[in-house]
């Protein structure tokens, strides 16, 4: 969760925790 948050904003990655970014949420 925290890991994805760090990449939030980059293409192909998302922040499942914050819910701000959502492109390809695998987890």
Curated annotation (Swiss-Prot):
Tissue: Expressed by the venom duct.
GO molecular function, one term: sodium channel regulator activity
Ligase recorded as keyword: no
Protein name, as recorded: Delta-conotoxin TsVIA
Compartment(s): Secreted
Keywords for the protein's UniProt record, in alphabetical order: Disulfide bond, Ion channel impairing toxin, Knottin, Neurotoxin, Secreted, Toxin, Voltage-gated sodium channel impairing toxin
Main location: secreted
GO annotation, cellular component aspect: extracellular region
Described function: Delta-conotoxins bind to site 6 of voltage-gated sodium channels (Nav) and inhibit the inactivation process. This toxin inhibits tetrodotoxin(TTX)-sensitive sodium channels. A test on mouse Nav1.6/SCN8A confirms this sensitivity.
Family in the record: Belongs to the conotoxin O1 superfamily.
Biological classification of the source: Eukaryota, Metazoa, Spiralia, Lophotrochozoa, Mollusca
Disulfide cross-links: 1-17, 8-21, 16-25
Domain notes per entry: The cysteine framework is VI/VII (C-C-CC-C-C).
